Amino acid sequence: MELNKKDVSKKVGIKIRELRLSKGLSMEQLAFDAGMEYTQLSRIELGKINTSIYHVYKISNSLSVTVPEIFNVLDEK
């Protein structure tokens, strides 16, 4: 089944939140490490905005995971 934009944003946001929490990071810490505003990260985690690949890259580096680890959630049923 093909996902729409909203579903993709929501799934990616949930995955980022799960990874952040598993690393014991606050939203403020991750936002700072990734070089973005706290409010932007919040909106990404909530699936409220589509973010750029660059921001996913920055977030993945800050979480010490690969970009595919974040996007693999899109292949889950």
Regions found by a protein language model. Name each.
Residues M1-K11:
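A detector for short, charged/polar N-terminal pre-domain segments
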Residues S52-E69:
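DNA major-groove recognition helix of helix-turn-helix/homeodomain DNA-binding modules
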Residues M1-E2, E69-K77:
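Short, charged recognition helix plus adjacent turn
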Residues E45, H55, F71-L74:
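DNA major-groove recognition helix of helix-turn-helix
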Residues G35-I49:
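Recognition helix of helix-turn-helix/homeodomain-like DNA-binding domains
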Residues I16, L30-A31, L41-I44, I70:
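Conserved hydrophobic/aromatic packing and binding residues within compact polymer-binding modules
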Residues I14-D33, K58:
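Short basic helix-loop element that most often maps to the first helix and adjoining turn
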